[in-house]
């Protein structure tokens, strides 16, 4: 940004602060809103929150019913600031409030957008049941703009929350329905997402053949897309499926390859790496290679304790 532009922005902000001393009511709330935009653009999210909250208070004193659109706008700024501050539970709560305002304003599209945003943030806050409830609410609501993609994404989100709640049978139903919708939308990337989650869910249900079917599709996509990072995850899922099917040599081959690829990633997914090592140890043990399996488990013990908090793992 040039010095001239920066000076213009500083001048604009100073003028707005000066107006604060001469305004009241709705005009004052509007000035606070403009100042919050300036704070947001320079990543001053705490300052933005303070300005937004003050503006919100004014509108409530003036009468909520006559200022719903202004309140929606302000609450959206508040939610986005909270997201940037990594406070997902608070941003989720704020999006829930936004959804209520949209209902009062008879805006079905806005309501759905806010409910979906709240559900996603509840997921980030590890509030799995609230996330599931939110995504189900979005799914069952009448959506005038519904498409196979939007319906599929709702189901995908429902399934991921169900996995966290150990509702694996229910998650399978959601993912299969999502997969069908993504195929209808001719979107191979999202069909792949459904296959990935189906491989995970069927494995949790110890259904080896179905886990292998979807893991193979997940793997095929990673090869066609030439995505090495994705291929590592796909090989891990395929290895787990082979293990469940008692195909131990195939499991060993896929899990060894998976680890070669997963460990190359700069931002390592330690939970996946540990899971692949533990699965590989099971395959090795089944193949009579207990010493090799034990060595592998000993090597990951401290990392496992660090990630999972297992005091016995160190």
Locate the predicted segments by residue.
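C-terminal non-catalytic interaction modules
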Residues: 1-15, 257-314
